């Protein structure tokens, strides 16, 4: 069985598939680019996306049999510790014009789309942040993230930016890394990232059922993801 999955699922995938009885071959990448590959005719049995829009588009185009949400996520800031000042919060860091802000690429990667939604929710201040933010990962022509590295850690430690906007599911791992600080973004500013799967072939139905099982949901949530809001 072949799965194309959002890159943010890579860290949980091995433990998630351990109880599943069938062999699964998974390839990870920005969900928007994976959707384009499926639309262009690439084969897979199941597509796991970091948003609902891409699976729904495949369903509407007749390329998927069913769509179901299975997890959710939020955003957080990761910053180089030396730029953090006592009293700083997410808003003060994003609006400090001397700091370079990095995101993933909107359109190609839902993480970048959620960052754009964050800027919109910030109102007028967010428009200035939007103009300053640079999409440094997750695009067609982005530099590849080195194997075994997280985007936030790689971008910040390589000196490309001082602030990275990414998924909160990485937060616990990033907090353990030297020189980095993770900052929470509160509601109502923080968008909810709804993860969903598109069942492409009937052979994927057992995997779809498994992903919604109590056992699988426990593994996903232990990895820093949130439950999916049921529609």
Describe each region flagged by the PLM:
Residues 62-68:
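Central helical "cap/lid" subdomain
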Residues 1-19, 25-27, 32-42, 49-52, ...:
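Exported/periplasmic ABC-transporter solute-binding proteins
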